[in-house]
């Protein structure tokens, strides 16, 4: 099939819950990609977590064969992309492999902040955009108002928007005709030499690493010797094919097509996403521009509740890493929690997804330490450090200055919830940069410290706006800040797993809250237990768990007072000895509850 004019490569852009995976299901159904009995909801969301949470995490691809009204048969390559801010990187990869996009907007809710970010990315990639207004069958649907909103915010023409209901299947044929007539075919191949973009890779236990590619020039066929231009690795192609969404093996992938190949590659880490794949014998001269590397911004420790599970955790993380190159980890040990791993994530949702996959797919019971971000430390001796583990923070006396990362956040919220959202941003040390109105929705741009966002910002934003606010952010700058290390001591012993780096203005409040929480969680012992929060050597908050007291006088019926005094003195001496040598066991449940994300 070398008719590039009959190929359409497109991605679907939409905010969470605006219906993109449902639309993808209807397109697959309409084009006969699966029989009716094989259809399930959200066909392209392959992970159970994706289906349950109703979100797309990994970008998926499918080739559809469509007989258009003009009598020609078209080959449509659909990339279903994630909508959540943590997975924006998956979106950028999908967009780079396509020429056009379907912008799906919920006609009952209008434009959301994350949609904006993805649309601007699509425009940067020179995409032709087809507007699709979904959920037309709902009583709250306001297509004309939403069209006006899109013209005001994004500035694209909405006169030929396609109105559909993906759930009931209304207007699906109109979407397919719009894809064929409005989206451009791939550019003509300028050379016969293979040049392909590595879009994604994942691990298959039978085939090894499966690589998703978009062929730009030339062709990719079985038994070909190929070279990865970033790593200079050479492999022999074993299988070539595409998804419909079932796996189909074919002989060759031509220019303009999206498909997969396998080549006995052992690790996903060997395949750099955005790399250029070329023929080993006749390599292309210039590599494709690729993507900017995806760096983790949120870090936390993962520890097994049972230390014998450590090897199992190590193997499980290695397997997850095979499918998720954006996830990083390294070994670390804690005096309170034993040996575990320090892990880096793209954001809090990414952290939750990894945690959930570890417990579900690998049956692991884990303790997660408080999330932290990367701080830049300037030492007095001129040395510069980057730290994401509070335990690694040097002595404050030796530090010249500390910088924390700030983000630029775009929040879109209905007018009636604006006050609550503004006060939340102010409480989180935010600085307002811009404030505008589009119809009855406010669009505010804030500069916020990432440290404040990783705790509970997203949950609180959703609750104070009854779920209507949408939030999108990107890293902005590092700025000097008055940061301190908040330590927690139990019976004068530092519990390193509970240490956090906080802004000085929030230290006392955070310390007091942690002490109160631990007081409720640690069971009473036979001695008083002091729980303290400290900054350096200064104690800023304290709670005391009162001792349990055994009634040593229960068997003394009357009799001499000196007998009672002797028993009480003996008890007192025993408690003194316990205070001196006794270790306070903090139960795992107390750790888990104390480290719950959320700053009460």
Swiss-Prot record:
Statement: the UniProt record of this protein carries the keyword Hydrolase: yes
Annotated compartments: Cell inner membrane
PROSITE patterns: G_TR_1, G_TR_2
Any one GO molecular-function label of the UniProt entry: ribosome binding
Family statement: Belongs to the TRAFAC class translation factor GTPase superfamily. Classic translation factor GTPase family. LepA subfamily.
Biological role stated in the UniProt entry: Required for accurate and efficient protein synthesis under certain stress conditions. May act as a fidelity factor of the translation reaction, by catalyzing a one-codon backward translocation of tRNAs on improperly translocated ribosomes. Back-translocation proceeds from a post-translocation (POST) complex to a pre-translocation (PRE) complex, thus giving elongation factor G a second chance to translocate the tRNAs correctly. Binds to ribosomes in a GTP-dependent manner.
Protein name: Elongation factor 4
